[in-house]
Amino acid sequence: MTCWLCVLSLPLLLLPAAPPPAGGCPARCECTVQTRAVACTRRRLTAVPDGIPAETRLLELSRNRIRCLNPGDLAALPALEELDLSENAIAHVEPGAFANLPRLRVLRLRGNQLKLIPPGVFTRLDNLTLLDLSENKLVILLDYTFQDLHSLRRLEVGDNDLVFVSRRAFAGLLALEELTLERCNLTALSGESLGHLRSLGALRLRHLAIASLEDQNFRRLPGLLHLEIDNWPLLEEVAAGSLRGLNLTSLSVTHTNITAVPAAALRHQAHLTCLNLSHNPISTVPRGSFRDLVRLRELHLAGALLAVVEPQAFLGLRQIRLLNLSNNLLSTLEESTFHSVNTLETLRVDGNPLACDCRLLWIVQRRKTLNFDGRLPACATPAEVRGDALRNLPDSVLFEYFVCRKPKIRERRLQRVTATAGEDVRFLCRAEGEPAPTVAWVTPQHRPVTATSAGRARVLPGGTLEIQDARPQDSGTYTCVASNAGGNDTYFATLTVRPEPAANRTPGEAHNETLAALRAPLDLTTILVSTAMGCITFLGVVLFCFVLLFVWSRGRGQHKNNFSVEYSFRKVDGPAAAAGQGGARKFNMKMI
């Protein structure tokens, strides 16, 4: 038996053994010959270990206690392609520390103690494509810090103590495609420093204390396609020209303090396909807010304070595929808000206090085909179906809860009010319908007045129109319009405002009232009637004059056109005069 074991084991002894690494392997590290990788993670190393094979391509030195990198520490590794020095205690890197790594493509220095990158640190790293400097103590980026990194495509400098980025800090980054700046102490962006990044395609700016976006911030970034602005608590407005010059395909402005959709800033972003405005205190989406975003496919407005989405709010969104309005204060979402619902594939309206009535009928009719992304919207009212998911509602309830009733104004008696200037005036307009109608008024000057209107005229809860400090120019007919998804109803009221008695007015008030009357706006009908009356009067006077001239000329009868004149020269004494006397002379004249 022993002999047979010896015979069987003989071929194994004859097999050649795998050659060991040329330079061996450091005692505290693990070497993988096939991938030429050396892993020395969590070994409590205070310096780069000796004995690393010269042909190593990947060196993992993360989570150690290395404090400094000197020029000779990595000089024996010319084949190195990826170096990870993350989560050490590196506070200083000597210029030339990476000079003998011509093949290095990835360098990770995340989570160290670097406060400054001196010039020359990245010399001869011509093939480096990724550099991670995040989670350090960097305070400033000096001019030409990255000037030798001509092939760098991705740069991470977030989670630092940055207070200033010099104007030429990014000079030389000709191929950079992605830049992340986050959790820094920057209070402003320099358009000049970003202007060196001509190939930049994605810019992420997160957790910054910047209060405004200026017009020149991104003007010199024609290739930028993706812009992310997240957690800027001081940002209250996106200026109209802040995105000028960009051709973005993706824009995200989240967790800021903007209170309105930045429609003016979005006006020229015709190539935008994805827009995220989630987690901002936006309460209303007005009509036509996205009318110029003809290529938009995804719109996210989740976790905001949305209470109203006005009709035609999504006008112009012809290619919308995904709409996320989850976790807001919406009671409804009408079909009239869309340019067309036929392109919609995914709808998120979960987390809203939805009123299940006829305004949501279009969703219920499509509940079997619409994708709710696994989060089904549910009814909040009426009480009979509270908590029921829209997708699970039986067809029988459609005729009970999803039927509209046209508004009807209860009191139809015409209101005629006469007031004295300076008094407050109110007109009642109570309407009922299903769902509850909204009430708006139209002034004699054709100006709409709603509950959100500013000025002396406003609509109170219940539909009452209040006009404060009535003036003579407020006189006229007011129209109440009650509307809901089922239709509308109208009602009229008349107001006459008399001037305040002269005895109660000071000269200054009388003068101001006269000026106010002169400034009272004239409608188009008044202007046309006044113009027509003036023209007719002028033409009538001209015609009357012509008739008088004609009658006068005919009444004079026939008269001579020719007449003769006889002229006798005065007699003058003297021989010269006597010689010239020839008697009387005659000549004819013709009157024209």
From Swiss-Prot:
Membrane-crossing segments per the record: 532-552
Subcellular location field: Membrane
UniProt domain LRRCT: residue ranges: 352-406
Ranges of residues in domain Ig-like C2-type: 407-496
Record keywords: Disulfide bond, Glycoprotein, Immunoglobulin domain, Leucine-rich repeat, Membrane, Repeat, Signal, Transmembrane, Transmembrane helix
Domain LRRNT: 25-54
SUPFAM superfamilies, A to Z: Immunoglobulin, L domain-like
Gene3D superfamilies: Immunoglobulins (2.60.40.10), Ribonuclease Inhibitor (3.80.10.10)
Membrane topology (UniProt): Single-pass type I membrane protein
Cytoplasmic side: 553-592
Coiled-coil regions listed in the entry: none
Extracellular side: 25-531
LRR repeat segments: 55-76, 79-100, 103-124, 127-148, 151-172, 175-196, 207-228, 247-268, 271-292, 295-316, 319-340
Gene Ontology cellular component annotations, sorted alphabetically: extracellular matrix; extracellular space; membrane
Annotated S-S bridges: 429-480
PANTHER family assigned to the protein according to its UniProt record, in alphabetical order: ANTIGEN BSP, PUTATIVE-RELATED (PTHR24369), LEUCINE RICH REPEAT AND IG DOMAIN CONTAINING 3 (PTHR24369:SF207)
Protein name as annotated: Leucine-rich repeat and immunoglobulin-like domain-containing nogo receptor-interacting protein 3
Gene name tied to this protein: LINGO3
